[in-house]
Design a protein with these regions (language model features):
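Basic, polyanion-binding surface patches
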Residues: 1-164
Length: 164
């Protein structure tokens, strides 16, 4: 029998992760959406693939299920906690009011002063419990602020990278 969801979350909160804002553009409309995501990882350098895990209850899930949907992963710097909170807690229409946004090759919004970003098309997807894992093929990327330390999340709070 698997462990409880509560036990699972309790264990995983002890694993530090980077913080990203995943932004989505639906080709079926002009709707854009974004949410804070820590379930992000690299998959393959050839072809360049990454993954994000999105809850089925999220608006992002509905948009990513649209044929031809694209998304960007904006990797946040240590000075972007407020923006992370904005995309975690505010209503959809208020999220993009902060930050300066450009449009990536795929049409997904990219944060101009992100530490780094990856612009992706949906390569494949896998339903996994309450979430779907989206594999994104990276179409474009940049590191606008290479000297900035990343924003980290560990044990229910934001952390800064202090060791060199």
């Amino acid at each position: 029998m698997p462990i409880s969801s509560e036990s699972f979350r309790d264990v995983l909160r002890h694993f530090p992760s980077g913080v990203t804002i995943v932004t989505i553009k639906s080709p079926a409309s002009e709707v854009v959406h974004g949410l804070t995501v820590s379930a992000f990882a690299s998959v393959s350098p050839d072809p360049p693939l990454i993954l994000v895990s999105i809850d089925h209850r999220a608006t992002a899930y509905e948009l990513l299920e649209t044929a031809g949907a694209s998304f960007a992963v904006n990797i946040l710097g240590h000075d972007q906690m407020e923006l992370s909170n904005r995309f975690a807690w505010l209503k959809d229409e208020d999220r993009f009011a902060a930050g300066e946004w450009d449009t990536a090759v795929t049409g997904a919004p990219i944060l101009r002063d992100a530490l780094a970003w990856l612009d992706c098309t949906v390569y494949s997807r896998f339903a996994a419990g309450s979430h779907t894992i989206y594999i994104g093929e990276v179409q474009a990327s940049d590191v606008p602020r290479p000297d900035v330390k990343p924003l980290l999340y560990w044990n229910r709070g934001y952390r800064n990278l202090t060791a060199k």
